[in-house]
Amino acid sequence: VGVILAFIYAMHKCKQFGLIPDHVFDVAFVAIIFGFIGARAYYCIFIDTDINFFDLRHGGLAIYGGIIAAAIAAAITCVIHKVNLPAMFDVGGLGLLIGQCIGRWGNFVNQEAYGAPTAGSLPWGMTGTTIINDPMVIAKQAELDAAGNGLFALVHPCFLYESLWCLIGFIALHFYSKKLKTFDGEIFLLYITWYGLGRFWIEALRTDSLFIGPFKVSQIVAGGCVIVGLALFILGKIFKTKKRGYVMYKDSEACKEKNEAYYARQKMLEEKAKAKKAMKQAGEEAPSIIVNDEASDNEETSADTEKKEEKTEKSESNEENTPDKTEEE
């Protein structure tokens, strides 16, 4: 559902960034496929147990692997189709926030990607049939039972934190892109910075993280995204917006020419389709017209025949009533 809604949004939003819908479709299609492959590969690489890449029964996807693979695939596709890469990444960043916001609720259904046990009094803490069997939750519950306060061991709903974080980011960047965007690629840089900040904090609460030595992989990647994204954003604001004659892609002549050619071609194809449909309808109506013409011809023929017969009868009757001149003489 998240992928579908993200795709619909990107197709609707692409005109604002000067992108052609067909190009967005091609890039999104490739990015989605490689995104799933990358998410699985990332998980299999960093998981501390042996796992079969193709054994999906036990799940195992990592969002950062999906983002990295999707970004690489999208970049290659943009180069092949000669599409403006920064503008495409801006649309992609907004779409990713939608997909992540909704997709995280799959963790709730599967009772996974949750955080450490709380003190038991957290109003939005969660539990479940899978969660209560977690060794850390069992230990926390024993501690609470020993205290005799009647509380249950609840865990941090990390999926909810990330879903809300992505929702807030999407709303903010959606409106930011309309009025405040000043250079191509800016929205994507803000996306990786915003998501990196939230993920770094949320990952500290999770108990199922992937590790490199003593460090959580997602925290390393998130921290790197924040540093790189923020640095490039500041540099873009300093150099691109102050650069004399800088024009965003959507306002460039190249963009206008591409869009004019594309929509002119679309209009021509629509007119051809309408003409073809009209010809088809005319072809379906033609047999009925022919049948009606034949019926009218048959009616006219029968009427003429009746008139001829009447004339013949009259002429015969006149001959019988006329006296023979030879007899009179």
What are these regions (language model features)?
Residues 1-301, 323-329:
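A feature for loop-to-transmembrane-helix boundaries and adjacent hydrophobic helices
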Residues 306-329:
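N-terminal leader/transit sequences and adjacent low-complexity N-terminal tails
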